[in-house]
Amino acid sequence: MVHFTTEENVAVASLWAKVNVEVVGGESLARLLIVCPWTQRFFDSFGNLYSESAIMGNPKVKVYGRKVLNSFGNAIKHMDDLKGTFADLSELHCDKLHVDPENFRLLGNMILIVLATHFSKEFTPQMQAAWQKLTNAVANALTHKYH
């Protein structure tokens, strides 16, 4: 289990309160699909993902990105039990979707990059460390059901 300090909890929660989930989620997922094009295979139903502009303008990418980032909101509410919080999603991604668990870490990195671009002044090294710890812990929780 990952332990978050009071300072880390405050840092994560204070920034999260300012996050536009739709914008940051959509940009994070779009960035993942562009930077790591092999991840596109999990999103065949999204239609045209053949270019950066197609991905950035794809409404399904934005909607799903919001859904993914909302799960981080759930993580922030349950930072003391991330494995329990993500148990069902871990099982889904492992047993049904067969997602390479490395993709969770990659997406976490994309979220950090997008947060840094949107909140550059507030995204101090301490803020980054707290968010990096959270994204790593979520990625770890999502791999919990993998065999």
Swiss-Prot record:
Entry annotated with the keyword Cytoplasm: no
Pfam family, one: Globin
All copies of domain Globin, residue ranges: 3-147
GO-annotated molecular function: heme binding; hemoglobin alpha binding; metal ion binding; oxygen binding; oxygen carrier activity
Family, similarity comment: Belongs to the globin family.
An annotated GO cellular component: hemoglobin complex
InterPro entries recorded: Globin, Globin-like_sf, Globin/Proto, Hemoglobin_b, Hemoglobin_oxygen_transport
Binding residues annotated for heme b, in chain numbering: Y64, H93
Task performed by this protein: Hemoglobin epsilon chain is a beta-type chain found in early embryos.
Keyword terms: Heme, Iron, Metal-binding, Oxygen transport, Transport
Tissue expression pattern: Red blood cells.
Transmembrane parts of this sequence: none
Protein name: Hemoglobin subunit epsilon-2
Native species: Bos taurus (Bovine)
Entry's Gene Ontology BP terms: cellular oxidant detoxification; hydrogen peroxide catabolic process
CDD domains referenced in this protein's UniProt entry, alphabetically: Hb-beta-like
